[in-house]
Amino acid sequence: MYGGKSDLEVLNSIYTSTYGKTAPDGYLADLLAHGSLESSITTVVNDLLNYNGFDAGTLASQSNYDSQLNTIMYPSYDVAGGAQGVSDVLALYYLVGIDPVSGTVNSLGSQINAGSLTFEQAASKFVNDRPALKSLTNDAFVKLVFTEAYGRAPTSTELNSYTSFLANGGDRGQMLVNVTNDLRGTVGANDQAAQQQFQHDTTPHAPGVIADLASQEQVASIFLAIPERNVDAQGLDDWSSYLNKDGHSLNSLTAKLITSAEFQKKGAALSGNDYIQHVFTAVHGVPATAAQLAQYAKLGSDKSLITTAIINDLRTSTATDAATVTQQHAFEYDIGTSLTYKTAATLSASAAGGNATGTVNTGSSHVLTNAETAVLVNAVLDANAATTVNLKFADHLANLTINGGSATTVNLSDNGVNTGVDVTVNNGNVILNASSGDDDVQVTSAANIAAGTAQFNLGNGNDNLQWAGNATNGVNVVSTNVRANGGNGVDTISANFITKQLTTTSTSGWLGTSYKTTVGTNAGQFSSFEKIDLGGYIGGTGATLNGSGVNVSSGHQFDFGVINGKATTDEIANAGSVTNVSASSTLGTQGFVLSSFADKVHVINVSGGNVAQLEVTGDATANSSIDFTFLKDATNKFNINFDAVSDSDVNAGSISLNSSSSAIFGTALSNVNINSSGTGDFSNVLNLAGSNSQVSNVNISGDHYLDLNIGSGYSSVRNIDASSNTAGVDITSNVAGSGQGIILNFLDLFPFNGITKAIAALFGFKSDDVHITGTAQDDVISAMGNSIVTGGAGADTFKLQSSTVDAGVTIKDFNTHQDTLVDQQSGLALTNNGAINGNNGTQVADYGYSSNDALQSILGGIITGGITSTINFFNAILGIKDQPLSHVGIVGSSAGSYVIVDNNGDGKLDNHDTLAFLQGVSHQDAANMYYNGSITTNGVQSHVTDIAHA
């Protein structure tokens, strides 16, 4: 068929026949570029078979392909070459009360259709091949046929006529043909019902058509209950057709199937409690208890009765306990899965309530079965009637869109199995009883929240209720009829739902004008939401004066005071006496969430305790900005927890903290704790912006890399500790300490501290350093002057934003063999890790080594006078006063080594140069470092000597 064609031509042909249209440009070529022809064909077909979205074109292709598959799997009379021959043979089976066998039906039917056998010949063969029929007396045979054909005994005339026919040599097959023709012709009024039943049971279904869903599900349930497998296509076709015939039931079908070799081999041969336990466990998914075994043992030894009882008891159960409900839902899911029911459906409310209505799986409108509901993963619901839609069986539902405008009650799975549903709500009147998982409910602009009656009952789980707001003049409008309850768990609600209104009245008198203001809020319409999401907040404060609107220009301000009862009225000029709101006990008790971009959001009157925290759950982008203003003495800490699920970096933007405390016994916001975590391979990013003179400690933990910028406004920060983080950090500290820490830290490392104390007192040296500690991973730490940095393990990069003789940086654990030092003022990088070497860099100049004895002598001389500045002090102790400086050089000591960068190239140490102390780095290791950068170096390497100056 495909001889001489290229792989692309073959794949294109298969795609076109599968989808009924040509493939998108480049799609097939890309598949072949990344796989074989066989794998590409598999992808093309499986993508269509497994599609569970709502694109009309793809759904049309899927429906067309399903029809082709159904015609192959359920060929009906196509196997026999036509309907007539099959109908004739089915009539023979019907008239003698034998269940048809597909092989015989197709074999004899094909011969009739081909003309190799007449109907009469086929009928004669049919009787002669069955000894049980041949052995009957003529009288018994006639009575059998009439009982099966008409549901009655033959009249005396009919009995005499046919027995006489047979007694005179008439063929029994011919008699069957005659009765068949009679039933296909005109019958008396009393036989019309029998005729209709005959025609129903002997008319083969069209190719690709199969019995109704209820029959299919019954067949599937038996196969799941005994052999514990999915029913095959032929079995489904045969046995669902069997159930559609008169007098057949689930029990009779079970009785037939139990006798089959496969069923006997796979459990049906068991007896007593062993059989009951086998079926019960297969159906329920858990073993039966002793009481349950005893219950079904009362049914006796009829295995078919026991089987159908176990199946029906579970499928029709009205129990409400989670265990039974879960078992019921699971069995319906297994049934639906075995019948390859679609996992996506467009639905509407059923007029009588209950399960939703749709055309899924049948192509015609019907109320979905429990099994159809159980397999749903994606659904679009038109909530078009004020009734109830039951989606509780949908334990695997992941995505639900609710359209329409009616006050439809939508019930989701609440038995604890569903992990959570992403619900998009385009209906402002819906009543949503969400699942017991972690639901994410997004209310869109299509839902009229300003005038709607929507109710959101989110139940168990850590749920999220989002709304982008509808503010056009800075104030969101929420109907007084809208309600939401987060239920159990830690739940989040968009700040846009919560409004603030200042209602002011004025009274004029001889003493002037007095004002009264009432703070109003709709916070009471919402309960059990522990966190407030500030992402996308566009609200503000509404205000009136004597009933007329007042312009408020506070921007996107969220007053947490409407929740804690501490709201303020600074937005208006004349508030007068204020009546505040009552505090809410169930809103915002665990602080705030940032899920997306926050456009200059101001949060005021923030409480302490667990409220003083922000959870970052999504990428807000670098342009996002939130500032928190706390109540006075509210808290001593603020926690920022990154907890996003992502595959790209999560940026919290800029966070500002404004706090105040009482002068006596006040509580200052001294600690900012950042947990950089999440799920996925990404980094977290945060900019601590604004000004806060109270924060002194920034602690970093978590298992995700953190890129942290601490603004210069955090002038009191003295400790930045990331040692509890396990992934690494990029810390930019724009905070400088004060004093002469680089000198004192150096001198404190020597045994002659009596001299150093005298020098500190003489020169007034003091130390108020910023301490920065990295992680055990590869960190980047950027520090200002008067900082002491500990990188931790890993290959770290230390960036000197500024490090001078007056305010230098000390690095306590610099490893020349793996770490890198970057001087941002000169643009130079220094290391001995191999990345910079003699081929691409320049070795540092070596200004010598200052021994302990030499230093002690120098320090003793300093005490006697002659040193008037820190520059002179360093020139003295480093022994570089009388030698010209190269562009980059080092001086060693037993305590570590100094790095000096002559930035202005004047050959001497001054305030324009970079000076940093590498504590613990030996003279030899320091001298072996190389540097490179865009600036040309000056000078040459100095001869190594032991400095001993008087």
Predicted features and spans:
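Extracellular glycan-interaction surfaces
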Residues: 239
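Solvent-exposed, low-complexity segments and loops of surface/extracellular structural proteins
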Residues: 2-9, 13-42, 55-90, 101-118, ...
